[in-house]
Amino acid sequence: ASPMYMAMLTSAVANGGNLMTPYLVEKIESYTGTTVKSYTPKIYKKLMTTQEASKLTELMTGVVESGTGSALSGRGYTAAGKTGTAEHGDASSTTPHAWFVGFSNVEDPDIVVSVIAEESGSGSEVAVPIAQKIFDAYYNN
């Protein structure tokens, strides 16, 4: 799966089971700062029930509060996520890819982050610190 695909699935969890249509540009402004065109989030389709999304959010929050994503705990925002270590090729001779997918502001999600660090080890040691920097930058701007 690609980081974009994983971000989309994670956003469905964050949005109560609704898979949103991805977009890269929120708005277009003229040189004077006037909004020329803006895009609003749209539901693509329902991937899971609200109850399923809530249970996944609960489990992903546990990963951050007391599991492999705990480096994101106590940072001034809530987060939910999942780490991963993906083997590839000949697992005996390659270093695994490090993954993290998650979202912040759990009660009213703001941002989804998907990180893959190829051939770098475990998700908790490599991908979570990268995600932490992204979340921190988002909330400190």
Label for each model-derived stretch:
Residues 1-43, 51, 60-141:
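Active-site beta-strand/loop architecture of penicillin-binding DD-peptidases
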